[in-house]
């Protein structure tokens, strides 16, 4: 990635990976969802600050610590008590330590025991003011979830968590390379799964700024989930034409800008527009922006 020109023409191969011994950086993350149902609009937003510490152990191994600060929830349908409950649960994994290779493939979750201990402490505190069968069911679900490292890592790599930083686009590329993968979304339609096929390629290189951009496009796959979507839309009382209305991915665009000197992400975004007929629309935006020293002061 170091000895290249401002275009990707003539380049045989690009290897996007970490190039550093130690790196500390603050990021600003935001997620916004806008749902329109029968003309009614609901907006939900999450903002947080993330601090990353990347430390090289050896040629192939890195330790990455991700700490979350200042989480802010904006949702008019969620009470202050519910927001506080969600914030306390979110604190369980607001400090994670991962072992990865130089392409950010995760080898293991280093501090899983500490995360489980943190969960039990949160449950003990929350149980004093939150009671009932549903609360107990939630607590048990969380215990089961955080006892399974595979489920934790899948969640961590979700775009709404740390997926923009720990993105899957660290890889070797040629000018014609297209990297493909499948992503499952649970927030397009309530109680329904939507599968998206992502395709990524290198778009451009800015030699002066030492930046490389990978763009991502997406399309719906696995239509066998459509029955689940139809059922959820119907149960929500959303008006639609059963003869012609179908789930539709109107937009799925992503951009990942890498620092060519370090291999870390400088800026990343995913923009999604989904619809079902005229009366159900969902837009989702994920953004991660590197903060400079002036922003941190």
Question: Which residues make up each language-model segment?
Answer:
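Signature of exported/secreted
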Residues: 2-297
């Amino acid at each position: 990635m170091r000895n290249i020109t401002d275009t990707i023409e003539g380049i045989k191969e690009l290897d996007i990976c970490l190039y550093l011994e130690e790196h500390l950086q603050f990021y600003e993350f935001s997620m916004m969802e806008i749902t329109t149902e029968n003309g009614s609009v609901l907006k939900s937003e999450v903002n947080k600050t993330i601090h990353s510490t990347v430390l090289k152990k050896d040629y192939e191994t890195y330790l990455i610590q991700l700490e979350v600060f200042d989480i802010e929830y904006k949702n008019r349908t969620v009470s202050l008590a519910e927001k506080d409950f969600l914030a306390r649960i979110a604190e369980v994994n607001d400090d994670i330590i991962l072992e990865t290779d130089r392409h950010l493939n995760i080898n293991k979750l280093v501090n899983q025991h500490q995360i489980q201990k943190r969960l039990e402490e949160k449950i003990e505190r929350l149980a004093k003011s939150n009671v009932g069968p549903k609360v107990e069911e939630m607590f048990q679900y969380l215990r089961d979830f955080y006892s399974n490292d595979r489920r934790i890592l899948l969640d961590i790599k979700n775009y709404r968590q740390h997926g923009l930083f720990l993105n899957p686009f660290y890889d070797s590329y040629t000018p014609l390379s297209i990297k493909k993968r499948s992503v499952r979304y649970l927030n397009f339609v309530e109680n329904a799964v939507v599968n998206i096929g992502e395709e990524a390629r290198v778009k451009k290189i800015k030699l002066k700024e030492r930046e490389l951009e990978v763009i991502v496009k997406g399309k719906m796959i696995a239509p066998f989930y459509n029955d689940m979507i139809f059922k959820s839309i119907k149960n929500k009382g959303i008006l639609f034409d059963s003869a012609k209305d179908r789930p539709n991915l109107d937009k799925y665009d992503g951009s990942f800008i890498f620092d060519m000197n370090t291999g870390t992400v400088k800026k990343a975004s995913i923009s999604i527009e989904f619809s079902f007929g005229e009366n159900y629309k969902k837009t989702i935006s994920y953004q991660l922006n590197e903060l400079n020293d002036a922003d941190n002061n």
